[in-house]
């Protein structure tokens, strides 16, 4: 079973109640989340990590091969201590000796990117979390 300083098993397990995720969730994903949390300096709320295939199928717009089903993705609420633009910068610049998040997608509620605690970000380690500083991440957003 994976372990993390700032993420409990109840936070990474599937939200449908099946309890799945302990044997699937990426340790690399949790390690990068812990580093992000330390850099931000305030608590981060996790919306979703692992989704079992049945739960994933019930999510509108979710693809069958979702990174959540593979245990390599996490949705994190923008903390109230940062604007969404500031939080996005932290995600983009979080690296350790192995690398950083491979992909992220930004979902902002008011569209401005300047509200505190506004929106959430999807992060994943689909390529092993080895993206190096200066390398492009896979990125999408809905700002605008």
Question: Can you say where each PLM-predicted feature lies in the sequence?
Answer:
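Short linear motifs at secondary-structure transitions and domain/linker junctions
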Residues: 20-24, 49-55, 89-95
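Catalytic cores and adjacent binding grooves of peptidoglycan-active enzymes
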Residues: 64-65, 69-74, 78-144
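Extracytoplasmic cell-surface/polysaccharide-interacting catalytic and binding patches
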Residues: 1-39, 116, 126-144
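Extended, low-complexity, intrinsically disordered C-terminal regulatory tails
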Residues: 34-61
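Aromatic-rich, lipid-facing transmembrane alpha helices and their immediate juxtamembrane interface loops
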Residues: 16, 63-64
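Disulfide-bonded cysteines in secreted/extracellular proteins and peptides
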Residues: 14-18, 42, 52, 81
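Amphipathic alpha-helical interface surfaces
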Residues: 25-32, 42, 55, 72, ...
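Short amphipathic alpha-helical surface micro-motifs
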Residues: 27-29, 55-59, 96-101
């Amino acid at each position: 079973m994976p372990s993390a300083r700032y993420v409990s098993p109840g936070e990474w397990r599937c939200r449908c109640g099946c309890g799945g995720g302990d044997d699937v969730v990426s340790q690399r994903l949790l390690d990068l989340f812990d580093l992000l949390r330390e850099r931000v300096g305030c608590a981060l709320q996790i919306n979703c990590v692992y989704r079992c295939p049945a739960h994933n199928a019930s999510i509108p717009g979710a693809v069958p091969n979702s990174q959540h089903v593979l245990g390599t993705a996490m949705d994190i609420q923008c903390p109230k201590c940062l604007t969404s633009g500031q939080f996005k910068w932290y995600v983009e610049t979080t690296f350790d000796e192995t690398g950083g998040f491979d992909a992220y997608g930004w979902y902002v509620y008011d569209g401005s990117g300047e509200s505190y605690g506004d929106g959430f970000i999807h992060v994943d380690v689909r390529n092993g979390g080895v993206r190096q500083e200066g390398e492009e991440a896979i990125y999408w957003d809905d700002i605008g």
